[in-house]
Amino acid sequence: ENTPNPAVMKYVANKLIVPALFEFKNIDEAKDAPLAKKLFMLPFVKEVFMDQNYVSITKYDVAEWEEVSSELREIIREFMMSGKEAVGAASVQKEKAKAPTTLLHGSEIDDTSKQIIDILEEHVKPAVASDGGNIMFESYDSETKKVHVILQGACSGCPSSTFTLKNGIEN
């Protein structure tokens, strides 16, 4: 599937690929992720983002999607059919143990931040995920009334992400 980010393509599977969210910025980060490692072997793959039943791939500008999309789809399909785990069990356990929606932990979160997290989870995250990305609450500054979030996957570096995020929150 195309995403709003022209450098990212989203590949959706009809079954679970990973039970948690994983973002790999390079092959070194993918040492326990056989699927991501395989994708990074291609010279045009810049980043790999996996969540539930999809893989979002960010490419370098050295190739056009029309030239590489079928090859990527086939690699993902063959990997899925092999029955291998996309990410090793140790990494899955480690990722599941992390707080899924925020960089903050329990007692550090004030009531306003909790409300913001709830809004992000219920209204923003599903829309962002449908575009092949993720949003994670980072902080809220009560003095300036500014919310800081981290965009991952297709949303990271997307030229329209600021507008889309602002528009989505306001609506």
Language model: regions and residue ranges:
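Domain-level signature for proteins that mediate thiol-based redox and metal-cofactor handling
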Residues: 1-171
